[in-house]
Amino acid sequence: MKEKNSFKGLCTKFEKSIIFFFKFVMYAACFATFFLLFAIDNREIIGLSRTAAVTLSTYLIMLFLLTGIYGKYDVGMRKTKQIVFSLALAAIFTDVVTYFELTIMKTNEANNTTFKLENVGIFFLVILIQLLIILLMTHTGNTFYFWINEAERCLIITSEEEDSKRVAHALDEFQKRYEVNGIVRYDISDLKERIVQADTVVLYEVPVEVRTKIVDFCYQNLKNIYFNPHIADILEQNSKSVVVDDISFFASQFHMITFEQRIIKRLMDIFLSLFALIVTSPILLISALCIKKYDGGTVLFKQKRATVHGKVFEIYKFRTMKEHVGNYSVTKKDDRVTPIGRFLRKYRIDELPQFFNILTGDMSLVGPRPEMLENVEDYTKELPEFRYRLRMKAGLTGYAQIIGKYNTSSKDKLMLDLMYIENYSILRDIQLLFQTILVLFKAEDSTAAFSSEESEDER
């Protein structure tokens, strides 16, 4: 037993190095799988040649970029399934791009005079082996991490215990990492004693002045701190340290999308939406015919939505419900949804007509989801800051849609939208577009990439 504890202590001491080793082995094995198997018929990719240099560079650059977008080897931070899914998607896209690049380079007078896909069997074998490697190394990494690190004892401090049940439920989803030991109000008499007994303190909807005192006490007692942000926190996160004479300040400047960013964003919207409409035109046509044939009703559902600066426009979707039915939210087995509509909703095909909204300039590819006018009015009454999200043009996908779930509160959606607006960049838009592809492969109810709430209310 003593030897076991000493071994665990040694592993704990070199925890980061061991996890780095697992990560290195995984990436190296995936890399070797691709190049060694393709080298069977392409000896030039493992020699000193231009083909080898270009192929190697393409593979490494794509893998680096895509793991940055979809998620890295974050053992201990995410579930094994989530890590495997992200890394697998990054590896597959990397393989596809590198495979086509290699095929194009082989299209010459010395090899094939016309473009021809070769070694397709090897390509799929590479993907299969890489998936097994990723699964094995991720499972090994997470198993090792949670063997070394026990679950953090979490104390949730709140103003309303009822509001924090959702937080507790979210933490319970990661039972190996978090152990919820209690939910208490911030004004209980023995709060400090409860904090001392915890490893991590989660502050949810705690008044700012109280939060400051709790954070100070946690800092003194070396406790991890999680807190949900207020509007001011988001505005301050991009602050710069400024010294005027000998007085220090945090300067938080009003963030506006620049003229250059606006032009690039609009050009991306035009070209990508036009490309999407061309590629999906068969799906659009078949969907329209199926809807019309089913009940002879209208093909498109139209509804007024709010976009940048409160401008009102008509959003387009495929009609998925029977016509002339009640105006209340849809349940999973709602008989108002047609069989065709259920299929369209499941695969989010009902959202495709919104590419016309993007092409005409009413929407953007990336941005806060356009809310129904009634929702904007109601949310603004509840949260006056909700109007801040109208500083950016509404989008088909965005940070709140990708991170959020179908039951994400209006306040949390607002916070996510403001994080997107305050940290806006063209690269961020590109990253979110790639992440949307990841979301499309997830379970229907796992996220709201194309907001479930909104598409459920056809009014």
Segments the model singles out, each with a brief description of its role:
Residues 332-393, 432-440:
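A short, structured surface patch at a secondary-structure boundary
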Residues 1-30, 139-278, 447, 452-459:
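N-terminal hydrophobic signal-anchor/signal peptide
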Residues 225, 282, 310, 355, ...:
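Residue-level signature of catalytic and energy-coupling elements of molecular machines
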Residues 232, 300-336, 397-415:
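Short, glycine-rich, amphipathic interfacial segments at transmembrane boundaries or analogous
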Residues 260-323, 432-459:
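A hydrophobic, helix-centered structural microdomain
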Residues 87, 91, 267-275, 347:
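Loop-to-transmembrane-helix entry motif
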Residues 1-144:
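Signature of alpha-helical transmembrane segments in polytopic membrane proteins
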Residues 2-7, 387-459:
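C-terminal terminal-structure detector
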